[in-house]
């Protein structure tokens, strides 16, 4: 599936008391990035709601002045759900800082009831996408 990107400059107001990127700020950008992927694949943002954040794992601290890239793509589809994998990396070094999965559901905007989206996954582009999809399957097996 297509990758979607969002880039942010980490500023002093984004930091916690340790001088690294605050988890709540990261979570906000993380969900927004995943939402963009789900909404663009579905085609109507008003019909997408977040159901579950399956985890947001910090791999390395993100410091003030860092430029971070959020890379998101749909890695699993159910009849009404879309699971998105998000990776946050340092734009300058490429080092992975954070990753995780979120699930979104398609709903009728008038009633909020779930409805099928009709999205079908394409063939994975590479081994990395295969691994992301396998991670989604492991999460789903544990639900």
Outline where the language-model segments fall.
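Catalytic strand-loop segment that frames the active site of acyl-thioester-processing enzymes
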Residues: 1-23, 127-143
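Active-site-proximal betaalpha loop/short-helix elements
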Residues: 30
């Amino acid at each position: 599936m297509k990758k979607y990107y969002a880039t942010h400059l980490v500023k002093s107001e984004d930091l916690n008391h340790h001088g690294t990127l605050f988890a709540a700020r990261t979570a906000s950008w993380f969900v927004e990035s995943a939402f963009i992927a789900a909404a663009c694949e579905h085609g109507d943002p008003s019909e997408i709601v977040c159901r579950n954040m399956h985890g947001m794992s910090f791999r390395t601290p993100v410091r003030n002045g860092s430029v971070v890239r959020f890379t998101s793509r749909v890695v699993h589809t159910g009849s009404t759900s879309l699971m998105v994998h998000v990776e946050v990396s340092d734009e300058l070094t490429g080092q992975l800082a954070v990753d995780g999965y979120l699930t979104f559901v398609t709903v009728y905007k008038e009633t909020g009831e779930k409805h099928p989206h009709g999205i079908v996954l394409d063939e994975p582009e590479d081994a990395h996408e295969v691994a992301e999809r396998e991670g989604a399957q492991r999460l789903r097996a544990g639900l």
